[in-house]
Amino acid sequence: IHRGSLFINPGGPGESGVQYVEAAAETSFAGVQGSYDIIGFDPRGVGSSTPITCAAANDAAATPAAGVGAPQADTPPSPVDGGANNDYKEKSPEVDAAASGTSFEDAAPRIADEYKQAEAQCAANTKPAGLLDHVDTVSAVRDLDILRALSGNEKLDYAGFSYGTYLGAHYAELFPSNTGRMVLDGALDPSISLYERQAGATKGLERALQTYVGWCQAGQGCPLTGGTEAGSQQVRDLIASANQSPLPSSEPNRPVTGTEIRAAVMYSLYGDEQTWGSLTSSLDEAINRHSGSLFRQITEQTVADVVNTAAVRQAITCLDYPVDGDMAVWSARHQEIKHDAPTFGGMTAIVDLGCQAWGHNGTREPAPIHAKGAAPILVVGSTGDPATPYEWARSLADQLDTGRLLTREGNGHVAYGRAAACTQLVDTYLLTGELPSPGRVCRDET
């Protein structure tokens, strides 16, 4: 039976659904391709829609210092993936100073200035003028309903991953009677603030690092010694020392900084045990042979379109949330998150400062989404998800009047395409409408 169109959003915000489906539809959605036309779309501001344009592709200076997504519930380098989490590559020493020890108040004016400069550059290069004020998620949801109508589908069948769950949940809230079979995998919790979203993702990464270190130490060839805490500290020590004196790499003029190592570690943690081996090799080379060549290879995978992806994420996210707090609040948060997430927490507290400086801000307060009257919505959460913590999936499934939670026991960001048993349950729902039973747990094959 042909069911019409299945619309896909791979996350971001800022990732191209068009490029993602071109690259991944054959493999990622093999189980449903016989029944659906798989449609990727670029939301407003993204890719082949009228894009937010900030600079020539080779001009990295226009990247906001850390982007709102640093780290962020984001598109994973997983089987369900078109791209990588791009914008944890802070270019600026000021920002890395904030991450490593300079007081928040001392670093704040310079960070704010970077965001202001980035906004000015994006505003100057983006046509039509004023687009930066109209790329919020609710506007994208209205566009998506027009796409649904144009495609001839009475109902929207949809699979959203990571940020795509936020887009999908808002669609179901605004257009419940148009909502068909909807899968939200790697869920964001729409009821929490931007800072809570950032802090949750940061703590998730910190937990994922400890899980990885334990896995590494239980296997062969792990360069990290002691227990998981000691091993995590060795990763932080490597980052700090490479920021002092960058590691030589296979490219003579491009030594690898600690900031880049942190980005590469984070990128690797979006994967799972299938891909963690390359992180172990990279750490071993850096710690025991004082070379960053393998880390350089990982960072190369993450830099595609870094300028515009970071800026688009910035623009969309800042419009989705009001600025929350002031310098005193942000400074206190900075101390708290550095304590809770010492490896990745350095940038987290700047999100509201960055959005305030960016200047295009939201007015809608975060609130639970109920989607009253919508068809059943399948929410999928992975217990070891580093970017969208499992409790967010539980929370979203509880908020939705017709939500059903499927739990994947496993690591890595998002479940679909990662674990065959989970993928099959999702495919069955999309093809037949049959939901997994309440409380259903699926596991990775070992």
What are these regions (language model features)?
Residues 16, 141-142, 160-172:
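Glycine-rich nucleophile elbow surrounding the catalytic serine of serine-hydrolase chemistry
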Residues 372-373, 378-381, 385:
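Short beta-strand/loop motif that positions the catalytic acidic residue
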Residues 127, 141-155:
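Conserved acidic catalytic loop of the alpha/beta-hydrolase fold
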Residues 70-82, 87-94, 100, 231-375, ...:
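Alpha/beta-hydrolase fold active-site neighborhood
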Residues 53-96, 170-234, 268, 281-297, ...:
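A catalytic-pocket lid/entrance helix-loop region that shapes and gates access to the active site
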Residues 386-391:
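Conserved alpha/beta-hydrolase "acid-adjacent" motif
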Residues 409-446:
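Catalytic active-site module of serine/aspartate enzymes centered on a nucleophile-bearing elbow/loop
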Residues 1-107, 383, 395:
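N-terminal cap/lid subdomain of alpha/beta-hydrolase-fold enzymes
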